[in-house]
Structure formats: structure tokens, C-alpha cells
Amino acid sequence: MARVTLVLRYAARSDRGLVRANNEDSVYAGARLLALADGMGGHAAGEVASQLVIAALAHLDDDEPGGDLLAKLDAAVRAGNSAIAAQVEMEPDLEGMGTTLTAILFAGNRLGLVHIGDSRGYLLRDGELTQITKDDTFVQTLVDEGRITPEEAHSHPQRSLIMRALTGHEVEPTLTMREARAGDRYLLCSDGLSDPVSDETILEALQIPEVAESAHRLIELALRGGGPDNVTVVVADVVDYDYGQTQPILAGAVSGDDDQLTLPNTAAGRASAISQRKEIVKRVPPQADTFSRPRWSGRRLAFVVALVTVLMTAGLLIGRAIIRSNYYVADYAGSVSIMRGIQGSLLGMSLHQPYLMGCLSPRNELSQISYGQSGGPLDCHLMKLEDLRPPERAQVRAGLPAGTLDDAIGQLRELAANSLLPPCPAPRATSPPGRPAPPTTSETTEPNVTSSPASPSPTTSASAPTGTTPAIPTSASPAAPASPPTPWPVTSSPTMAALPPPPPQPGIDCRAAA
């Protein structure tokens, strides 16, 4: 019986969506490697991060099948993360950029899976769709703790808050091995698909036989759902053919193209091209006037001005009410604070103000105090930005996603529970100046050493009252055989003790104690 050879048939598609100006997603699909990265950081930073990580993984597609798949994936991911760190060092303006990553390395009947962030991997097997990755997000922690249901997480306002990503800082991705079977279909997707499209609708699209048509349909569904974010998908079938595809597919930022679908280049045009045609209500154009319009009277002009003033005032009041009901966590004067309003300014006026400040007790118990409050709990100190680990510090500096006051307090508690640096150790106690250190064992057991504090040396010759040159230590007088000569005072040499490790640096690997 001939041995069954399993290979991949795959398709990849990417679209910048209907809201974003550029595509920060990058995707690679090849005979052995399927990889998807969703960049973040704004402007060009996100697409730079996703390109660096995909470039670091691409060589795995050329390797011979076999060996330790997870070790290969782990090494490639660390190389990509190091590339991000090096890029940030060369261009400090890119600080805070990062990317998610979900990738599969295929080798016959087994595959390795690496995951970090909120992109997703799905498996369709025997008609059942299963999510094979776990979101590294704030709302997923709420689901794990039983505070919200998975259905509530799907529409939670903080669902985009990522807790782990590749940002150039040390991080451990999730690595798993899986069995591959003929007939399996795998889907890798960015949150541009999983946020606006339900799992049930994704399942329907994945049941389309051809992988290219299935991928195209998934992009359409995301755009019909509003296309709020870049959307990228990889659809791959495990088949038992003698040969599979060999030409790799690049899409998204790494390919230099924002879109792969042949859609109009405007958001409205692309939206109308994929949406169902709606009935157009025809309007009869007004007939042209056959007489000259009279000039507006002063009373009518005054009425219009008054109406515009009322509308503008109402708009300002409504806008002010909306702004005052919005809260987010950000850095204010070096402290992790809950801000009220929205980020930015209008006509030189700030649209936000500090509302609550985080306060930590020596046992890391979090409380909130009002901004400007003269006193809080006696044993608490303000939660500083430098108390956080570097990845969360960068997110807070940029401002976490806004929502209600309860949402912001929940984010603050999550930071205090999981994102603080360890406390710096207390400084070692030292002897007060002027007080001699306690004698060593060798000094206390020397029988004939004088204990006078005025004597600089324990030897008799060094304390001779005459003004002659002190005797050489090796030529001690034979009259005192019970006291062997000592060439120097008996002290412990600093070179004999091991050097202590460098102390932890506050704000880098520890936080200052309260």
C-alpha cells in the first residue's frame, strides 16, 4: 500500500477595510508555512512590525520537513521580535509598534502552531469549526475569570485591548503541536474578520469547496460588516495528493499592495460593490424659477442666525455631555491615571482632564483617589508609569481604549494585577560612619595583638616610640617567639569577596518601593 502524502492547498487575501487609510496586516502562505501578522502602532509603524516578523519566518517555508517544528518556530519568532527591537533602536519614533502573529509550520501529518495576540486560528474538521488559538486580550481574561460570557466578549468595548504582542520586548509565544488529517481546513485571520463576523457565518463561508472562493467570501463578509479594520485571511486544505502548491502567496503590507480584491479604490465605492443593490428612490428635480427670488429680509436673516446659534449651542452641549461620559486610562504627569474626556484638543483647549489616580499599598492593593485630593490612604503611593512593564507602559503612554468609568477602573485593576514590575529590594544595611566594623575571626583569635585603638598596627615594631624607621616585618625579634610576626594588619581583603550583582534599576527591572 502506497504511503499517503499530505500536502496543502491554500489561498490568502487581504484588504485594508472601509475605514483605515493603510493596511498594517502582512500574510505569507506557502507549501509549508502559513503566517499572518496584524501590525499595530499607527501610521507606518504597524506595517513595519508585521513585515519584519513575516520576513523572519519566511525561510521556514524552504526548510526540509521534519525536525523540531516548535523549536524552529520559536527561534524564528524571537528573531522577528529582535528585529523589531533593533528597528526601534534605530528609529525611536517607532517605539510602541508591535504585531500579533499566528503561524502554522506544516510537515506531513503533523504541524506546529505559534500564536501571540488577538489574531485567530480555526480548524474545520468533519463539519465542525473549532478555534485553536486563545486571544491574548483583556476581555479574554474577563471570560476566563467568569466575569463576562463569550457572547458578551464579542461586543465588549475593550475587546481590542491586547495583553501580549511582539513589540521588541521579551515575551513568550504560545507553541502547540497538532495532528494533521486529510480533509482538514485551516483558517488564519486577523480581528478584522473575527470582530464583525460571527463564527456561524465564518463556518458557512468555509464550507465553500474552493479555498480561493472561500477566502474571497470571508473578505466580503467582513466588508459588509462595516470593514472597521484591516481584514486578512488564509484558507488552507490538507489533501492527500501527490503534489501540492509550491508558489508562495504574499498579501497585505508585506506585498506592497493594500488590497487584493478588484474593488473600487474608494471606501464608498468598495462598500457599494459588495453590498446588495438597494432600491433607488428617484426624486423629481425642482422646476427652475421663472422669476427672480426676493432678497432676504432683515427679520428672516436674524431668524436664521438665531437658529444656527441655537443648533451650535445644542451641539456643543451634547458633545460636552458625550465627552464627559467618556473615560480612558493614560499617563498624566508620570502617573497612571483615569482621564475623563477624549484625547486631543480643539482650538487650543484640551478635551480631557485627570479624574482618578491609581494608588498602591505596600501589598499592591489598588485604590483610586480623585485628582488633586490632598490625602488618600496613609500607606499608599501613586501608581507611576515607570512601575509598569515596558509593553504595558507603552500602551498606557499612548492611551488605552476609551469606554465607561467602570471599563477604565477595570483596566486599571488589570494593570495593577498583571503588569507591575517587581518591587526593588531594600538597600543593604551598612555600619554608621565612624564606628569600626566588628573584628573578624582571625583578629579575635590572635593572642598577642594589642587592642589599643591608637595603634595603627598590631605589631610591636610598628608602634615603637623612637623616630627610627619601622622594622621590616620579616625580621621580627626572636625575643617574642609566641607571637609570630605579621607583615600587615589582619584585615579581610576586598579582593577575596565575590562582587555583588549590580543592583536592579527602578523603572527598568523593578519599581521603587512606596
Curated annotation (Swiss-Prot):
Protein residues bound to Mn(2+) 2: 38, 191, 229
Primary location class: membrane
GO molecular function annotation: metal ion binding; protein serine/threonine phosphatase activity
Residue numbers binding Mn(2+) 1: 38-39
Cofactor: Mn(2+)
Transmembrane listed as a keyword: yes
InterPro entries: PPM-type-like_dom_sf, PPM-type_phosphatase-like_dom
Cofactor, free-text remark: Binds 3 Mn(2+) ions per subunit. The third manganese ion is unlikely to be involved in catalysis but contributes instead to stabilize a flap segment, which is partially disordered in the absence of bound metal.
Catalytic activity: O-phospho-L-seryl-[protein] + H2O = L-seryl-[protein] + phosphate; O-phospho-L-threonyl-[protein] + H2O = L-threonyl-[protein] + phosphate
Name listed for the protein in its UniProt record: Serine/threonine protein phosphatase PstP
Gene: pstP
